[in-house]
Amino acid sequence: MRPWFSSVARRLALGASLGVVALTVIPNLSCAARSVSVAETESLRRLELLRVEIARHDDLYFRKAQPEISDADYDALKQELRELESRFGRRVPRDPAALRDMGDDRVSGFPKARHRMRMLSLEKTTTESGVRAFDQALRRLVKPPAEIAYVVEPKFDGLAISATYEEGRLVRLVTRGNGEEGDDVTAAAGRIRTLPPRLAGAAWPRVVEVRGEVFLTFAEFERINRGRRENGRPTFSSPRNLAVGTLKSLEPEDREVRQLDVVFFGLGAIDGHAAPASQTQLLEWIAQWGLPSVEDARRVDSIDDAWRAVQELGGRRSHLAFPIDGAVIKLDDAVGQTAAGVSEVAPRWAIAFKYAPARVGTRVRGVALQVGRTGVITPVAELEPVALAGARITRATLHNASEMERSDLRVGDFVWIERMGEIIPAVVAVDTAQRGTVSAPFVFPRDCPGCGALLVRALDDANWRCTNDDCPARQVRKVEHYVSDEGVGIRGLGAASVEALVRSQRVREIPDLYTLTAAEVTAHTRLSAAQAARVVDAIQRSRKAPLRRVIAGLGLPGIGPAGANALGARFADLPQFAAARESDLQQVEGLRPESVRALATALSAERTQQLLARLAAAGVGAQSATADAGTLAGKEVVFTGTLPTLSRRRATELVEEAGGRVADRVTAATWRLVAGRNPASKLHQATALGVPVIEEAELLRLAEAAPE
């Protein structure tokens, strides 16, 4: 095995242990195996594992925005697959999808829209020789090659987006998807603070598709995480993941809470206007149209100057206000771009240079074990403090027991740390050459660190698990999840307060929250009387949370946000949901068979039934009564802009408590558009469709409610 690939190999082995990369026969691969020697059988198996693992990581990165490995490790997977496919030649059918440089970010729950012009990705390289090879190939395509100038731009680390403006008005916002069609996220345009609903001036095309990237600045990312830390909530892993999650959330978001940005640097279809003569002119036009453009672009006259610009930008990236993961080199001249043409997935006149992730070495002081709400035990390396990309790193995840065993990580080892996505610190390699003469493999304890119960681990499981449902550590995590924004959203009840309430045994399970008094909260936590009163008020309001949010907060097996939404739409209230059988769950659109089985098993458990019954008795999840009797029963409301006194979440709660529903898009079915400061394109859509527009005060009157 290649030494440089050891960390990737461990992850592949981990995937196999999880059952994710079980040996699934690729069409004709078993036949091909008959024509190879016994010595090549293992290589064939590895080739198959690589294809499955790459597909899994594509899904995690492009669709779920939850990458598990660094870009460098991902690129290494693809490189080894290329080498194996090359070695076997025609004896093994190739899998073009596994090696495509363009993923597919389309997910369920969004309408699809076709791009007027195909939206491409970029070829990538990580070496200077790759950059120079690109230059040589381009010179063979562009005649004459003497006048070749380049534009070097930052490679923003966000979500690729295409905005269509017709007659100067924003009419469509679409993700790249598979290049031909993407997810229509026009309804979320208001979440991007720098995206104008209208172009500036008048010298714009009749129709134009502008391409760019939606991202989150480091300052905004840190502001969001700082607030979550102060409230005891889990922090987000990276700006890119949060940007993708915010734009593609099916829940209405408060723009004051998560403020996205966008930058444009490319062009799709253009009608009623001459095409730009160069990339430089395009960037100038984008700025003249009032759109955010690339400010750090640099025009250079040679590949030598381009390489110097790439290196200089790399040296400044830790000081930039936004995340980048590379630099893009583009041929400036539009005529030359046309001559160079495009491949299946990328233009031949541009290339992205990916920067190596920041890496530092340090020693492992110890290994801490964290207990999750499902009982999974996660090992975390406690490190000698080290600076990495401007941050002080003291801890890094070790993923699970299987990964630790395969890496043979030991206390005292010298390890290499990288920041995945420039944010998440991860142990990527163990330097055994620096290991002391006296060391011992880490042995997982057999007792739960949270309750002392015996830990168990199935043969095919990568994790040790605590099976004690009454484990205080598990209960803390369960309650934390329930009160979080992913659940019913009880503001002011942070991790420290939840832990104090559970440790004091005043809160043993989630339903105990609904019997808390302000005096008890004050007695068992560090909250003041005023803070405790607000917490109890928030708890009482959460009784009216929609069923979908209650289900999401319970964290039932196999059910994520999308599944909770589907279940909330299917069942009238919590008792009806509790009574659901497997045959009922099979009728819920969007639930996978394995999720149905896991949920049916959970609902059949006496403990689950008791918990749901207690919640129902507390008046939780009784959405049908509210929906039938509310002043907004059956009415659809859409929000745009920032409201004067209500957060977007609270405004949504008011509508739902009054029996209405909140949508992200203005359609003919919209009852009212509630407009605040800085409204987005929804205001124009409402005017065009004849939808009445009201302000917050009118909403409060109609909902017969008052602001917080």
Curated annotation (Swiss-Prot):
List the Gene3D superfamilies hit by this protein, alphabetically. Answer: 5' to 3' exonuclease, C-terminal subdomain, 6.20.10.30, BRCT domain, DNA ligase/mRNA capping enzyme, Helix hairpin bin, Nucleic acid-binding proteins
Q: Which residues form a coiled coil?
A: none
Kindly indicate whether the keyword DNA damage belongs to this entry. Answer: yes
The BRCT domain is annotated at: 627-708
Which GO terms fall under biological process for this protein? Answer: DNA repair; DNA replication
Please state what class of enzyme this protein is.
ligase
GO MF term (any one): DNA ligase (NAD+) activity
InterPro entries linked: BRCT_dom, BRCT_dom_sf, DNA_ligase, DNA_ligase_AS, DNA_ligase_CS, DNAligase_adenylation, DNAligase_N, NA-bd_OB-fold
Reactions the enzyme catalyzes:
NAD(+) + (deoxyribonucleotide)n-3'-hydroxyl + 5'-phospho-(deoxyribonucleotide)m = (deoxyribonucleotide)n+m + AMP + beta-nicotinamide D-nucleotide
Active site positions: 155 (n6-amp-lysine intermediate)
Name the cofactor(s) required for activity, per the record: Mg(2+); Mn(2+)
A GO cellular component annotated for this chain's UniProt record is:
cytosol
Amino acids binding Zn(2+): 448, 451, 466, 471
E.C. number: 6.5.1.2
Q: Where does NAD(+) bind?
A: 71-75, 121-122, 153, 176, 213, 330, 354
In terms of Pfam families, this protein maps to: BRCT, DNA_ligase_aden, DNA_ligase_OB, DNA_ligase_ZBD
- CDD domains for the chain: BRCT_DNA_ligase_like (cd17748), LIGANc (cd00114)
User: Which UniProt keywords are present, listed alphabetically?
Assistant: DNA damage, DNA repair, DNA replication, Ligase, Magnesium, Manganese, Metal-binding, NAD, Zinc
- Fetch the HAMAP family from UniProt: DNA_ligase_A (MF_01588)
* Role summary: DNA ligase that catalyzes the formation of phosphodiester linkages between 5'-phosphoryl and 3'-hydroxyl groups in double-stranded DNA using NAD as a coenzyme and as the energy source for the reaction. It is essential for DNA replication and repair of damaged DNA.
Q: Record's family?
A: Belongs to the NAD-dependent DNA ligase family. LigA subfamily.
Q: What is this protein called?
A: DNA ligase 2
- Give the source species: Opitutus terrae (strain DSM 11246 / JCM 15787 / PB90-1)
Q: Which classification does the entry list for the species?
A: Bacteria, Pseudomonadati, Verrucomicrobiota, Opitutia, Opitutales
